Amino acid sequence: MEKFRVIGSDKPLVGEVTISGAKNAALPILFASILAEEPVEVANVPHLRDIDTTMELLKRLGAKVSRNGSVHVDPSSINEYCAPYDLVKTMRASIWALGPLVARFGQGQVSLPGGCAIGARPVDLHITGLEQLGATITLEDGYVKAEVDGRLKGAHIVMDKVSVGATITIMCAAALAEGTTTLDNAAREPEIVDTADFLNKLGAKISGAGTDTITIEGVERLGGGKHSVVADRIETGTFLVAAAVSGGKVVCRNTNGHLLEAVLAKLEEAGALVETGEDWISVDMTDRELKAVSIRTAPHPGFPTDMQAQFTLLNMMAKGGGVITETIFENRFMHVPELMRMGAKAEIEGNTVICGDVESLSGAQVMATDLRASASLVIAGCIAKGETIVDRIYHIDRGYDKIENKLAALGANIERVS
């Protein structure tokens, strides 16, 4: 099993990094391509394990899929309607196949998904939304099965709670429904806006994405088109935190400050000099004191849960006392005991972690437990004294495109080993 071997240094991380396209936009966009009847081309797609799995799934459904820079999908030849367990067992995003399949073909089934072990991520909201659009849902032998006679029907849907995944499922399915769908209490993440932009390029009529009310006027068919995936705001934030905790200066290219305003505000509060341009962001921590910040995760435009682990590390290395409260997912502090193995000080109370500042961390053997936690462990290894081995890095490969190469370009001593 592959690992990262990191030799820590007190040398700051300095340089430029090109940010990849957002996994959390690329995945729903690739699944949404099932809705189209003509070829689509998707650019700026990151090279990730989940992307490879999704491309393989689309092929299994009968689509023609290739990658030559951009990802090309011809969904006109789809003739299978089941996403099998052997393909989707490691990837919860596979639930996004269900809405497009039932919307276009009147049927679809998806094995109940896997993915990160960070608490309950129920598919109930996806199922309820599809039922409100007229689909009949059954659960059999570990599969969610959706069927409808004719077309789905537009509806007024009020989501019980804000859910990025369910917002995408309902929006995609409603694109081919008969009539208009109004989705209230919708999630507002940039990746939802990007998915809506993609669908509109194919001929969908979606308005309001990025607000809490999305309106979808159903159309009879979607054609082909080209789209470039939005920048990954979480990868951006991860490298900016790496600059901050190492006392360095990093410029992130191919990204935009409006995607992560809450994160940039907290970096400034932590003492960093933050500058932004049209397609770049820089954080400069040279000769500045790192200060702890208090954070409460929240749906967009609040502070993203996917940046919580990185800021937990920041608080551990900062002066003062910062309190981080996790409101989105349960059981999302599994990185804390691993960081404590490296000498960090922290106390977990329910859904809150309180960090004490330490002068330095020491290298240790640690284990990645989920995607974002693994990133915080790798960054911790970069600034620790001695050698850190990060095990189970398949987690990080699910969400970061060549993170070791990008960190090495900033001066980190990191290599992938077996």
Curated annotation (Swiss-Prot):
GO CC field: cytoplasm
EC number(s) per entry: 2.5.1.7
Cell wall biogenesis/degradation is among the record's keywords: yes
Keywords, in A-Z order: Cell cycle, Cell division, Cell shape, Cell wall biogenesis/degradation, Cytoplasm, Peptidoglycan synthesis, Pyruvate, Transferase
Residues binding phosphoenolpyruvate: K23, N24
Residue numbers carrying 2-(S-cysteinyl)pyruvic acid O-phosphothioketal: C116
Family annotation (InterPro entries): Enolpyruvate_Tfrase_dom (IPR001986), Enolpyruvate_Tfrase_sf (IPR036968), MurA_subfamily (IPR050068), RNA3'P_cycl/enolpyr_Trfase_a/b (IPR013792), UDP_GlcNAc_COvinyl_MurA (IPR005750)
CDD domains for this protein: UdpNAET
Binding site for UDP-N-acetyl-alpha-D-glucosamine: R92, R121, P122, V123, D124, L125, K161, V162, S163, V164, D306, I328
UniProt superkingdom: Bacteria
One function term, GO molecular function aspect: UDP-N-acetylglucosamine 1-carboxyvinyltransferase activity
Protein location: Cytoplasm
Known pathway: Cell wall biogenesis; peptidoglycan biosynthesis
PANTHER family in alphabetical order: UDP-N-ACETYLGLUCOSAMINE 1-CARBOXYVINYLTRANSFERASE
Family: Belongs to the EPSP synthase family. MurA subfamily.
Annotated protein name in UniProt: UDP-N-acetylglucosamine 1-carboxyvinyltransferase
Organism (species): Vibrio parahaemolyticus serotype O3:K6 (strain RIMD 2210633)
